[in-house]
Amino acid sequence: MTTIVSVRRENEVAMGGDGQVSLGNTVMKGNARKVRRLYNGQVIAGFAGGTADAFTLFERFEAQLEKHQGNLTRAAVELAKDWRTDRALRKLEALLAVADKTASLIITGNGDVIEPEQGLIAIGSGGPFAQAAARALLENTELSAHEIAEKALEIAGDICIYTNQNRTLEVLPIKD
């Protein structure tokens, strides 16, 4: 699996992920890029699950963003509908974390679109470790969103065997 974490704080939203791709109990690749920018750099998206499945979902999600002029929530709801009802998409096993300047969402293959509390998303096998670390840092420090995401990924990578220390981090400034 993997670890993807997204943190929203004050003037930025950050999303990061590790780079490990596993096949069973074998590490196949250590520098995969599981977090990327979409829709002219205005949206950050990350995936946990099958790599091929994630690329399909990224393409579908970006098409929905184009169709709905970058409206993140609308695009997420439409992707979730397609994912739940389309026979081919239903077989895909992945979770998407998406964020823009206004919202952070988790999209699942069950048709769920979830806006988490405190602007904190953590998915994948290392998600619970990253979430615990990020929540503690959010509540007890003044660190920025990207510093919290980086540290949460580091901690998850130390604990989860399916998460490595090769990280990708994307940051979107939030302007008032």
Curated annotation (Swiss-Prot):
Activity regulation information from UniProt: Allosterically activated by HslU binding.
GO biological process: proteolysis involved in protein catabolic process
InterPro entries: ATP-dep_Prtase_HsIV_su (IPR022281), Ntn_hydrolases_N (IPR029055), Proteasome_sua/b (IPR001353), Proteasome_suB-type (IPR023333)
Main localization category: cytoplasm
Keyword line: Allosteric enzyme, Cytoplasm, Hydrolase, Metal-binding, Protease, Sodium, Threonine protease
Binding site for Na(+): 157, 160, 163
Subunit structure: A double ring-shaped homohexamer of HslV is capped on each side by a ring-shaped HslU homohexamer. The assembly of the HslU/HslV complex is dependent on binding of ATP.
Protein name: ATP-dependent protease subunit HslV
Lineage: Bacteria, Pseudomonadati, Pseudomonadota, Gammaproteobacteria, Pseudomonadales
